[in-house]
Amino acid sequence: MPQKSRYSDEQVEQLLAELVSVLEKHHTPTDLSLMVLGNMVTNLINTSIAPAQRMLIADSFVHALRASIDEGNIH
């Protein structure tokens, strides 16, 4: 997601590492990780964003997610 952010790379990486650590601690399979993270995103949008802006934010999130997906093979 190559976009200018008000947050430092260090802040983002630290939080990401902590979230990954929690998922690893619980030996969370990929599908469950995606379900939990998706539910977290939904909850954040529904509780922190004005109703009139929710679909715009969700669409922006989906666009950024799709743009950041690496379509290369991992296996």
Curated annotation (Swiss-Prot):
InterPro entries named among the record's database cross-references: UPF0352 (IPR009857), YejL_sf (IPR023202)
NCBIfam families in the cross-refs: PRK13689.1
Family label: Belongs to the UPF0352 family.
HAMAP family on file: UPF0352 (MF_00816)
Name of this chain's protein: UPF0352 protein PMI0824
Organism whose genome encodes this protein: Proteus mirabilis (strain HI4320)
